[in-house]
Regions:
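N-terminal export leaders
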Residues: 3-7
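N-terminal signal peptide c-region/cleavage motif recognized by signal peptidases
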Residues: 15-17
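N-terminal, post-signal peptide beta-strand-biased segments of exported outer-membrane/organellar beta-barrel
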Residues: 20-95, 174-176, 275, 286, ...
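Membrane-embedded beta-strand positions in outer-membrane beta-barrel channels/transporters
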Residues: 39, 57, 86, 120-122, ...
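Transmembrane beta-strands of outer-membrane beta-barrel pores
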Residues: 46-48, 75-79, 93-95, 102-108, ...
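Outer membrane beta-barrel transmembrane domains
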Residues: 53, 165-166, 170-172, 183-295
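Transmembrane beta-barrel wall of Gram-negative outer-membrane proteins
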Residues: 83-172
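Outer-membrane beta-barrel translocator domains and adjoining extracellular loop/strand segments
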Residues: 85-87, 110-117, 139, 144-152, ...
Length: 295
């Protein structure tokens, strides 16, 4: 047998098992994206950032401090029409907080996947500074051929807040799966633990907050992200700058920047957020914009 024939035989032998393998289930990249534009500026650290509607995407217990209402949105559109958008709202009903939100990701035309979509609804019970939350999540992935794979899953979250000084949080995501269409999605179970600490009194004119978050996910190594933001506020108006650094989730295809920057303009109960990612699934040098209103 010639060397050329040997290579051909080896190729057919190797190809046999591969062709018999099942088609890999789609992985929803959107689940690896930051929960908000603020979190995007902190390299994705958002599990221990309580009091905003977008928290339901990574830790349902995070909406517990909301006293009346919180509405939040964010987006980014690149020249080739690749798009990322999110919106969420949360409110308090007696001893409970409820929230609902959605995220959408449209990929560049060079990627086989057309888009990702996720909806989530959360309920949180709070007693004192301790909050326990649960969320139901719908996720879908569509490819360029128009095939859509859909699944349902759930999240759990626990948060302990120490007034406005600090918060400790733990979140379990993608716990269980119910297939809606197709063979279901690849939803790696994920555990995150986070800590945030206000280094300055939040009732003063200064702002300085540190957050640290570690995440363990199936088929992925442990990741730790550190974020810092600081600024000044006078009579409800102010400016905050932020930066974060740390490894990004494997579910996002290792395409998110490990280091990010961002900032916010504070306008009383409202704020305008900005974040910059040098590298993202939707392209390079991505600018994200968002807004938040908490009356």
């Amino acid at each position: 047998m010639t060397r050329r024939h040997a290579f051909l035989v080896a190729g057919f032998v190797a190809a046999g098992p591969v062709s018999a393998q099942e088609r890999p289930r789609p992985r929803p990249v959107i689940l690896g994206f930051p929960s908000s534009v603020q979190a995007a500026g902190l390299a994705g650290a958002g599990v221990a950032l309580p009091g905003y509607a977008g928290a339901i995407f990574v830790n349902p217990a995070g909406i517990a401090p909301i006293r009346v209402l919180s509405i939040e949105g964010g987006f980014s559109v690149t020249p080739d029409q690749s798009t990322y958008a999110m919106a969420a709202a949360a409110s308090r009903l007696g001893s409970f907080n409820v929230g609902f939100g959605g995220r959408y990701l449209r990929f560049p035309s060079s990627v086989p996947t057309f888009d990702n979509l996720s909806w989530v609804g959360a309920v949180v019970y709070r007693r004192g500074g301790i909050a326990l939350g649960s969320a139901a999540k719908y996720v879908s992935v569509e490819d360029r051929a128009g095939n859509v794979t859909r699944s349902l899953t759930s999240d759990l979250g626990l948060q302990v807040a120490f007034f406005d000084i600090a918060a400790v949080a733990i979140s379990g995501r993608n716990l269980g799966e119910a297939r809606v269409t197709g063979d279901g999605l690849d939803l790696p179970q994920t555990l995150s633990m986070g800590f945030s600490f206000n280094l300055l009194d939040t009732y003063s004119n200064g702002r300085l907050m540190l957050t640290i978050e570690s995440t363990w996910a199936e088929r992925d190594r442990r990741r730790t992200v550190v974020g810092l933001e600081g600024g000044a506020v006078f009579y409800g108006l102010g400016v905050v700058a932020r930066a974060g650094s740390g490894p990004q989730p494997g579910v996002a295809g290792n395409l998110l920047s490990n280091t990010t920057i961002g900032g916010s303009v504070l306008l009383g109960r409202a704020r305008i957020d900005y974040a910059y990612q040098h590298r993202s699934v939707i392209g390079s040098n991505v600018h994200l914009f968002g807004g938040r209103w908490t009356p």
